[in-house]
């Protein structure tokens, strides 16, 4: 089955939007604190039931799907015309957006996964020393920050896809002269 760039951009943006929404909902549903119960020589923390752990993992999975779909969409042979990856990496603008999309995707994954795993550990290991006065919870705002980075990554993948389409059209239209045309186009846009 042949895909078009529009279909691929819809897949990328759908996965990214779902990741963003799940991350925001996970941040909002996260327990603010646990209730400490003093027992013999320790404190047992009782945390309310919340869906933030499952939502955090789902947000992470959809972010990975967005990144994979974004990467795949850039190098996909549209209209049956395959181009070498080296052709795309001749464009400095494309390189910048491609690398920033990868970086924000990685940061979004870290910001989503870290508090999710931390919260899961807090729910699993509930006993703390008697000196504990407050039950620990993950830092507030990390899941929301991960959700925003996920949305940023999605938008950057879409920009990288648009730049890849421009590189593809220039190379197909101008052939081997496409590299010279690409260099002239970058010089004219930077001036």
Question: What is each model feature region?
Answer:
Residues 28-35, 75-79, 117-124, 165-172:
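Transmembrane helix-loop junctions in multipass membrane proteins, especially transporters and channels
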Residues 33, 42, 73-81, 129, ...:
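Generic alpha-helical propensity signal that fires on short helical segments
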Residues 1-81:
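N-terminal helical submodule of small eukaryotic multi-pass membrane proteins
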Residues 37-41, 112-142, 170-180:
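Juxtamembrane loop segments immediately following a transmembrane helix
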